[in-house]
Amino acid sequence: PAGQEKRYAAEVEVLSARSRAVVREPVETLLVGSSIFRLWSSAATDLRDADLVNHGFGGSRTWELVEYVEELVVDFSPEVVVCYCGSNDVNAGASAAAIARRVEIFMKTVEDALPGVGIVYVAINRAPQKRDRWAIVDEANQRIEKACRKGPNRVFVDVNEGLFDARDSPRTELYLEDGLHFRPAAYREVFGPAVRNAIERVRASSRG
């Protein structure tokens, strides 16, 4: 929002500079979003992409994703952008409509700058820590999924099914003690296969 302090300006500058120094072009897959991605240290292995660029930063919110879209995404001209963001918006009291609106602005900005780009949006997870706000999480995901259907090269991937057990309870063994962030098994068993499949789908649609 206008006037909000740029909490992660320094972190974003360091992140983008570090990537520019080592990234080999063209970038096939770029991850961007909040700490769920920032902490995905095994992403290159789990997604079977040794050259993957991971630009997860801070405890970012969707408006910060829009704020830094040039530095973290557009400047690297990726073929596929994989995004996870929204959890921190929910914690901050944002409405589902506001979260979805900013995600759509982000997607449209990327598409306008990079024609033909594929976008994978990973659903906000229904973390145990957010149990009292699952209704907002669900509504935000529904709105974002609908927005993804508006673009031919957008894929919405819902990881929540894999994060719940047969009794429809969160698989707590996949979470750290904070009930929000994940253990390596969650990335390996749930995020990796689901996101890989989504990337393959969006690549196929991008190729036409």
Question: What is the predicted role of each segment?
Answer:
Residues 96-106, 134-141:
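Charged helix-capping and loop-helix junction motifs
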Residues 126-208:
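Catalytic His-Asp segment of secreted/periplasmic serine-dependent ester chemistry enzymes
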Residues 114-118:
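A short helix->loop->beta-strand "cap" motif at the edges of active sites that frequently abuts
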Residues 55-58, 80-94, 104, 108-111, ...:
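Cell-envelope and extracellular/periplasmic
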Residues 1-31, 37, 41-48, 150, ...:
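N-terminal secretory targeting modules
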Residues 31, 83, 120-122:
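Structural beta-sheet core signal
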Residues 31, 52-54, 156:
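Conserved beta-strand scaffold positions in the cores of enzyme catalytic domains, especially
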